[in-house]
């Protein structure tokens, strides 16, 4: 389950020193952190995966074998829809970019409450739903 931990993805913006410092800070708040490598071709760890529920991750194929996902169900984005992995879960609802029809259909078929939102404008700067949110 991801309910008891935070995954910190390394990237051009987050180096190991920063991730280690954040992990130490999270520990003072009673949260366990794990540092993950972001594979080449994935801009940021969180743009390549999103939480469907506490035990299920939507991920691009490049993150399918991420060690931090051990014990979780990993659902891969449909072919050609890698940006759809940048979902945002709010309680039991998953927000998905409205242009990712195959992903929306796949999640809906799993019984997930899916809300499509327009993301075309934010996608122009390589951003998605998680980039436009503040959450804990």
Where would I find each of the regions flagged by the language model?
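Histidine/cysteine-enriched polar flanking segments
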Residues: 1-136
């Amino acid at each position: 389950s991801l309910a008891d931990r935070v995954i910190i993805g390394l990237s051009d913006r987050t180096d190991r020193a920063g991730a280690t410092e954040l992990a130490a800070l999270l520990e003072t708040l009673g949260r366990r952190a794990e540092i993950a490598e972001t594979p080449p071709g994935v801009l940021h760890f969180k743009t390549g995966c999103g939480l469907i529920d506490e035990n299920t991750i939507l991920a691009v194929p490049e993150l399918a074998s991420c060690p931090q996902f051990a014990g979780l169900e990993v659902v891969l984005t449909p072919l050609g829809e890698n940006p759809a992995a940048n979902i945002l879960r709010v309680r039991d609802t998953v927000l998905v970019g409205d242009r990712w029809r195959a992903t929306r259909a796949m999640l809906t078929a799993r019984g997930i409450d899916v809300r499509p939102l327009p993301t075309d404008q934010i996608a122009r700067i390589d951003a998605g739903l998680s980039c436009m949110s503040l959450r804990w």
